[in-house]
Curated annotation (Swiss-Prot):
Its main location: cytoplasm. This is UDP-N-acetylmuramate--L-alanine ligase. The lineage of its organism: Bacteria, Pseudomonadati, Campylobacterota, Epsilonproteobacteria, Campylobacterales. NCBIfam families: murC. HAMAP family: MurC. GO terms for molecular function: ATP binding; UDP-N-acetylmuramate-L-alanine ligase activity. Keywords: ATP-binding, Cell cycle, Cell division, Cell shape, Cell wall biogenesis/degradation, Cytoplasm, Ligase, Nucleotide-binding, Peptidoglycan synthesis. One of its GO terms (biological process) is regulation of cell shape. It comes from Campylobacter jejuni subsp. jejuni serotype O:2 (strain ATCC 700819 / NCTC 11168). It catalyses: UDP-N-acetyl-alpha-D-muramate + L-alanine + ATP = UDP-N-acetyl-alpha-D-muramoyl-L-alanine + ADP + phosphate + H(+). Cell wall formation. SUPFAM superfamilies: MurCD N-terminal domain, MurD-like peptide ligases, catalytic domain, MurD-like peptide ligases, peptide-binding domain. Belongs to the MurCDEF family.
Length: 432
């Protein structure tokens, strides 16, 4: 009987959710990571034994090892587990084991999947949840319920979504991201999305996506440009809300700001309609409080709003900045300052022009060094692409303000940080 499960790279947002879920299911969980983080500290408080850094002895007496995508073959724990003949599964390979007895509601897509799955989790409040973001109403990326139903954020970046065996599948969009995993062939990525949808009994898709609009099998289709009407935004006590009408179902109000919020919520509503009546959905939508690092307001007063956002692709940044412009207009703020920590050299190099375009509407742009995420550096002339940007080595939080390494102080207007790397910590760490 497999009882003792060890996670290598347990501090990752996706893998920590799996560890939490299996612990609730009754397994004895341990894990390790390179360095301590907020997640590893929380796991320890929850009773998980976490070892820092990796050491081969950490896997002694384990029945199964699950490792994150960041783990290389030369990792001492991975190597030793192989030598000892302990079964080792990648996160992707472990999914069938984790999801085996569940009715899975899986959400995939290049953008909006965390938001869509977390809104769906608020609507289907009897379901367990495993997502790659922290749900603010629960303070965790995992919710365990004694239920057959499970809302799961499915990842296309490593094709692991094909192991999620969805009962219901939502695809928000099929824009080409993570193409390196698919041999840089868009057709392979699209084929994977088709496979993912084909398995499901119920399918909900954004039918205005260039690829999804040609999907042949039966599905519930959202045509955003005609199905979503009267989309308006408002601020209540500095909190952002978006109201919209969906098809002939009446008005809905969701926490967050921007048309993309209405789109994500609409997909979740159309999925939930298979299980709930419309008034229950309308009411439960009000429970949704957003997710950490998605238009996440860290400080707000009449003069200054400081926001942390995970956006690291031009499409996401553009959508979020359009929401920021709306917030500034409604709140009467002076200007928008964007602080950008590029994530991965390959993504930056591939989308340079699009990034430049995405930031066109801001009053000030501050650019931090690239967060490499283990990649080799690529020589790029960023100063030529962003001629008006201020390039700084670092930025830190002092009280409610931000101070750059060159001494500049950012203290008014709407300041928004973008990135999937370290920027979140920089924006949150107050130097008392």
């Amino acid at each position: 009987m497999m009882q003792n499960i060890h996670f290598i790279g347990i501090g990752g947002i996706g893998i920590s959710a799996l560890a939490r879920f299996l612990r609730e299911k009754g397994f004895k969980i341990s894990g390790s990571d390179l360095k301590e983080s907020k997640i590893t500290k929380e796991l320890e408080k929850e009773g998980v034994k976490v070892s820092i850094p990796h050491h081969k002895d950490n896997i002694l007496n384990k029945d199964l090892v699950i490792y994150s995508a960041a783990i290389k073959e030369e990792n001492p724990e991975f190597k030793y587990a192989k030598e000892l003949g302990i079964k080792c599964l990648s996160r992707k390979e472990a999914l069938p084991l984790i999801l085996e007895d569940k009715r899975v509601f899986a959400v995939a897509g290049a953008h909006g999947k965390s938001t869509t799955s977390s809104i769906l989790a608020s609507l289907l409040d009897d379901a367990s949840v495993i997502i790659g973001a922290i749900l603010k109403e629960f303070g965790s990326n995992m919710i365990y319920k004694e239920s057959q139903n499970l809302v799961f954020e499915a990842d296309e970046s490593d094709s692991s979504f094909l192991n999620s065996n969805p009962y219901l599948a939502i695809v928000t969009n099929a824009e080409a991201e993570h193409l390196d995993h698919y041999g840089n062939e868009v057709s392979k990525l699209h084929h994977a999305y088709t496979q993912f949808l084909d398995v499901a009994k119920i399918r909900v898709i954004n039918a205005e996506d260039e690829f999804l609009k040609n999907y042949k099998n039966e599905s519930i289709k959202l045509y955003p440009s005609k199905d979503i009407k009267n989309c308006t935004m408002c601020i209540e006590n500095f909190k952002p809300f978006t109201s919209f009408e969906l098809k002939d179902l009446g008005e809905f109000k969701v926490f967050g700001m921007g048309y993309h919020l209405a789109l994500d919520a609409s997909l979740a509503i159309l999925a939930a309609l298979n299980f709930l009546d419309i008034e229950t959905i309308r009411t439960r939508l009000k429970n949704y409080q957003g997710i950490k690092k998605r238009f996440d307001i860290l400080h707000a007063d009449e003069n200054l709003v400081l926001i942390d956002d995970y956006g690291h692709h031009p499409t996401e940044i553009k959508a979020t900045l359009s929401a920021a412009q709306e917030y500034v207009k409604l709140g009467g703020y002076k200007k928008i300052t964007a602080i950008f920590e590029p994530h991965r050299y390959t993504r930056l190099a591939t989308n340079l022009k699009e990034f430049a375009k995405a930031f066109e509407g801001v009053d000030e742009l501050v650019i931090l060094p690239v967060y490499a995420a283990g990649e080799e550096p690529i020589e790029l002339d960023l100063k030529a692409v962003f001629p008006k940007a201020l390039f700084v080595e670092d930025i830190k939080r002092e009280g409610k303000f931000l101070v750059a390494s060159k001494g500049q102080v950012f203290e008014e207007g709407l300041i928004i940080g973008f990135g999937a790397g370290d920027i979140s910590n920089k924006l949150r760490q107050k130097n008392e």
